């Protein structure tokens, strides 16, 4: 592997892209299997519900989290909140707005309404993360200013 193929995460760009795609699949499988587990239990099949739950947990706890570690998905709290704001902003400003418009243009009013409802929820998420970022930044400035240094774990 040549140096120009190595990303800032120490892996090739193609491997990183493959890991991210795999993570999307694992996350979707987790959510889908949790839904299937609930449905199986509603139909009286606890054994099948347990199988779906067990598989869902493995998809998340092993596959997704191990892949997330390889791509260094999580960073500092401030980085993670900034990433969350970016994702929520995209959903509010672009994704769900476009989806609602397209559904309405196709005559799928119920789908358009659902996308608009979700868009409003995402706007609340966006605001909550923006407020969290302000608190993080204020806390960090206060801690650095009052101690004259960054706080360490042994300080608490």
What are these regions (language model features)?
Residues 2-156:
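Non-heme di-metal
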